[in-house]
From Swiss-Prot:
Domain F-box: 7-52
Sorted UniProt keywords: Kelch repeat, Leucine-rich repeat, Repeat
Organism: Arabidopsis thaliana
Protein name: F-box/LRR-repeat/kelch-repeat protein At1g09650
Pfam families: F-box (PF00646), FBA_1 (PF07734)
Length: 382
């Protein structure tokens, strides 16, 4: 039976049935199916349908991986964006529709979290983008005040020894509003308060300050993580704390002490694993991952990575904590497998099965850039 015949058969079904079938499909075929009829196009472009389709995709298997700014060596051409289906041995290059093909425009960092299939690309000296890798939809982000200040400081910025914190990206769980957030330490760059917080507002297409900002300085190296409608950072205190920013009320609070103290910023990471806030400390020869129970405010040990074993891929000298990316379905196994990578070598993604204590390569290349997991969706921001 030809594709045309199958589409004609689908059109003869009640449209409610057609919708139920369509929402179980991936984003790529749905983009093509918009050409079948005006009714199909209207359905597929409906925000309600897109939410249901995204929920189905989340429940149907593992996420894909977006690899940002891959570069094999200093003389190689940078590949701005490539996407990988886990289990595949090759990745697919994604065109960047917002820029001319200029080398300097291909290098970005990426928010540690995706949100409804959207990711946030950023750089400390140039405009960023909220981007949907599946549909190629994007929204440019103008320079925030921090970026403008760093540009004004110029080359003197490097003499300050200032560590620029990473951009956070999340969603207000009550209103569904998406918010890029830049929280940064202020004193080194001539600002008065301990920290400054800027939030991007899509309704005005502008950044605005949040006041009061965070009461504690933050550790600049680990990226912020969004869990359950709040962004989280490590505080720069003798006793490391977890600082939370509620994306609805836009207020800060300390939610817990970390399960470790007096640590170097390169030895700790924060991540979202199955919608749970997790933190991890590298303490050679292991790296323990802790999961936070928001109900009783306690931490429990989720698993431990043996860095002696991973040194075969990551090198004998581990200078910073590896970064967990996602928990993968273990099929019949009770516990899911952990996907993680080395932030220094950026060549290999490894899967750890905590039940069997095994380690396997999920993907390997000369460069994997900055990887972030996402579920492909049709969602955009109007």
């Amino acid at each position: 039976m030809s594709k045309k015949q199958r589409c004609l058969m689908m059109e003869s079904l009640p449209h409610e049935v057609v919708e139920c079938i369509l929402e179980r499909l991936d984003a790529d075929p749905l983009l093509r199916f918009k050409a079948v009829s005006k009714q199909w196009k209207s359905t597929i472009e409906s925000p309600f349908f897109q939410r249901r389709q995204f929920t189905q995709r989340q429940q149907s298997g593992n996420p894909d991986v977006l690899m940002v700014s891959r570069c094999a060596d200093i003389n190689s051409e940078i590949e701005a964006l490539t996407t990988l289906v886990l289990g595949s041995s090759s990745s697919v290059k994604i065109p960047t529709p917002w820029e001319e093909e200029e080398e300097e425009d291909k290098e970005y960092s990426v928010s540690q979290d995706s949100c409804d299939g959207l990711v946030c690309l950023f750089d400390k000296f140039k405009s960023g983008f909220v981007f949907n890798p599946a549909t190629r939809w994007y929204h440019p982000l103008p320079l925030c005040q921090l970026q403008q200040l760093l540009i004004a400081i110029g080359d003197g910025f490097y003499d300050l020894g200032y560590r620029v914190s990473r951009l956070g990206f999340g969603k207000d769980k009550l209103t569904g509003t998406y918010k890029p957030v830049w929280l940064y330490n202020s004193i080194e760059i001539g600002l008065e308060n301990a920290t400054t917080c800027e939030v991007f507002d899509f309704s005005t297409n502008a950044w605005r300050y949040v006041s009061p900002a965070a009461p504690y300085r933050i550790v600049g190296c680990p990226a912020p993580v969004c869990v359950d409608g709040s962004l989280h950072w490590f505080t720069e205190c003798e006793e490391t704390k977890i600082l939370s920013f509620d994306l609805h009320t836009e207020t800060f609070q300390v939610v817990s002490k970390a399960p470790f103290a007096n640590v170097d910023g390169f030895d700790i990471v924060m991540c979202n694993l199955d919608n749970r806030l997790c933190v991890s400390e590298m303490k050679l020869p292991n790296q323990v991952i802790w999961s936070f129970n928001s109900g009783n405010k306690t931490w429990h040990k989720m698993c431990s990575i043996n860095l002696d074993i991973t040194s075969r891929w990551f090198g004998p000298t581990q200078v910073c904590a590896v970064l967990p990316l996602a928990l993968l379905d273990g099929k019949k196994k009770k516990k899911k497998k952990l996907l993680f990578y080395c932030r220094v070598r950026k060549r290999t993604m490894v899967v750890h099965d905590d039940e069997t204590k095994s380690y396997d390569v999920a993907f390997e290349a000369d460069s994997i850039g900055h990887p972030v997991c996402y579920f492909p969706s049709l969602i955009s921001i109007s």
